[in-house]
Amino acid sequence: MTIEERTVGSMVVLDVSGRITLGDGEGLLKEAVSNLLKQGRANLLLNMAEVAYVDSSGLGALVGSSLAARRQGGAVKLLNPSRRLHDLLSMSRLLQVIEVCASEAQALESFEPNRRVAM
């Protein structure tokens, strides 16, 4: 798994690719989020467009990251989850914990509600 980091306004976008599974990504994701939270950067958008698979450990890493960000007044939101991941989040009622955004602009607007975002 690889993670590329970029900043857009007040949020950090993590472009994630590969698999988020036990021993193959979930630890890397937790570490990346933890490091950002230690820097006070708690508004995170995970771009999941290139994520091939997420197992239960990966799902746990997503939920744990979301809860950690909330404790710091931020949030972890998802962009472009696979249909399978979206269905899994829906069936497990985790969409109440992790918001899925339709676009980077929508995510940025949700983090910065008073900012007008060009579409």
Model feature map: region roles:
Residues 16-18, 103:
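Active-site donor-binding loop signature of nucleotide-sugar glycosyltransferases
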Residues 100-119:
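A charged, well-structured terminal subsegment
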Residues 1-15:
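Short beta-strand/loop segment at the start of cytosolic alpha/beta domains
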Residues 4-6, 79, 101:
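General small-molecule cofactor/ligand-binding pocket signal
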Residues 10, 94-97, 103:
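Glycine-centered tight turns that cap/initiate beta-strands
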Residues 20-98:
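Amphipathic alpha-helical interaction surfaces in cytosolic regulatory modules
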Residues 8-10, 83, 105:
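Residues that form or immediately flank small-molecule/cofactor binding pockets and catalytic motifs
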